A protein has these predicted regions:
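Soluble catalytic domains of enzymes that build or remodel membrane lipids, polysaccharides, and related
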Residues: 114-290
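N-terminal signal-anchor transmembrane helix
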Residues: 40, 67-125, 131-149
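Non-catalytic terminal accessory segments
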Residues: 1-101
C-alpha cells in the first residue's frame, strides 16, 4: 500500500497508512478473540481474504516488474504497475464472486461390491449457507440442476443455513426449498453453521420444507441404508460404528457426515459411500489445488 500510494502521500502519510492498516487488522483480530458479535468472524475472514489477494497482487506485480523492467522506462512502468495492482485485486474478487454464484456439476461413478437392482443417481450439495448472500435464486438453480441430472435421491450434508433462519424466513425461501425434490427423497444433516446458534429452528424449518433431517439416525430407503451424523459440535453424537450396530450392512450404506474428519475410521467400516462438505474446496485459491 505504501508503494501504491507513494506518488501522492509523503513520509507522514505513509506512516499514517501503515498505522491505520495495523490498527484495522489487529483490531479485528482482538474483536474476534473477545467474541464481539457473531458477525465479527465473517468480517475478519473477509478482511483476511482481502489481505491474501493483496499479497497475490504484490507477487504478480513484482514478477511483472522483473519481466518488463528491461523493456520499459522507469516512470511508464511504475504508472502501469500501480494501475495493474488494484485491477488485479478487483479481478480476483470478481472471479471469486463469479465462482461462488456459478455452481459446477461434477460427476463421479462409484462401484460397490453389493447387489443393487439398478444404478442409483445421487445428487449431493453441501454448504449452501442460505442467508443474506445466498437465497431463493441459488435454490432455484440447485433445483434445476437436480432435475436436469435426473437424480433418484438428494443428499445435503450440512451447513444449509448461515447460522440462523432469520434471512431464510425474511426472504421467504421456504417455497423455493420445497421445490427441491427427488423420487427417493431429499435428506440432510446439520453442519457446524447449523449448530452454532439456531439448531432447533433450523431443523424445524428444513423439515417443514419437506426435507428429512437425519440427526445421528439410520434410515432404510428403497433397499439403501442411509446414515446421517450431526456435526462434530454435537459432543454426544455416537460414532458411525455405533450407529451401524444392529443394522443390515449387507445393503448399500451411504453416510452423510458434514466434516470429513473421521473418514479414515469410516473406511474400515462397511460404509460404501461417504458424502461430506465443510472444506469448501479449499476455501480460497490456491488451497483448492491441494
Amino acid at each position: 500500500l505504501q508503494w501504491l500510494f507513494a506518488p501522492w502521500i509523503g513520509k507522514v502519510g505513509r506512516r499514517w497508512l501503515m498505522g491505520i492498516s495495523y490498527f484495522i487488522t489487529n483490531g479485528l483480530l482482538v474483536g474476534l478473540l473477545l467474541e464481539l458479535g457473531h458477525m465479527m468472524f465473517r468480517v475478519v475472514a473477509f478482511w483476511m481474504v482481502i489481505l491474501l489477494f493483496v499479497m497475490y497482487a504484490a507477487l504478480a506485480t513484482f514478477i511483472l516488474y522483473l519481466l518488463l523492467r528491461r523493456f520499459m522506462a522507469r516512470q511508464p512502468l511504475s504508472r502501469s504497475l500501480r494501475l495493474f495492482a488494484p485491477l488485479f485485486v478487483a479481478g480476483l474478487l470478481g472471479f471469486g464472486m463469479y465462482n461462488a454464484y456459478t455452481p459446477v456439476v461434477r460427476h463421479q461413478t462409484v462401484f460397490i461390491n453389493k447387489k443393487m437392482d439398478k444404478p442409483l443417481r445421487i445428487g449431493v450439495a453441501s454448504d449452501l449457507h442460505l442467508g443474506i448472500l445466498f437465497g431463493a435464486r441459488q435454490l432455484d438453480k440447485l433445483t434445476d440442476i437436480m432435475k436436469q441430472e435426473q437424480v433418484d435421491m438428494v443428499l445435503l450434508p450440512g451447513d444449509l443455513m448461515d447460522d440462523t433462519v432469520d434471512a431464510y424466513l425474511k426472504e421467504n425461501m421456504k417455497p423455493h426449498l420445497q421445490k427441491l425434490t427427488a423420487p427417493m427423497g431429499v435428506y440432510a444433516t446439520l453442519g457446524n453453521h447449523d449448530w452454532f446458534r439456531d439448531q432447533k429452528r433450523i431443523k424445524h424449518e428444513l423439515e417443514a420444507a419437506g426435507l428429512t433431517v437425519l440427526a445421528n439416525q439410520v434410515l432404510e430407503v428403497n433397499g439403501v441404508l442411509l446414515v446421517g451424523r450431526s456435526d462434530d459440535l454435537d459432543r454426544k453424537r455416537p460414532s458411525a460404528e455405533q450407529l451401524l450396530e444392529g443394522q443390515n450392512t449387507q445393503l448399500p450404506v451411504l453416510l452423510m457426515d458434514h466434516r470429513p474428519t473421521s473418514i479414515e475410521a469410516h473406511a474400515r467400516l462397511p460404509i460404501d459411500v461417504q458424502v461430506s462438505g465443510h472444506v469448501h474446496n479449499g476455501q480460497v485459491a490456491p488451497a483448492n489445488l491441494i
